[in-house]
Amino acid sequence: MTELFNPDNPWETALLFFAVFCSVLPALLPFWFKIKKIDSQVSNSHDENLRDEITRGFKEVREDIRLLHEALNIERRERIAGDEKRCA
């Protein structure tokens, strides 16, 4: 009867680890690449959170709309004042 692999010295132990490593590595490498691809898409690579950026963007848009509204109100008041001068 043949006995199982029995590493008695460090070289045989190293050979055993090398054989296991060589057989497991090709199976795990595709998963590692998929995980790295997902991580690169999900990880935050900048200092500011996306939620803070969106909030800041909404504030800027609201400020722009407020300024446009104010400009239109000023123009409307000027037109009303001009019409009143013309009619008077």
From Swiss-Prot:
InterPro entries recorded: DUF2746
Protein name in the entry: Gene 30 protein
Gene: 30
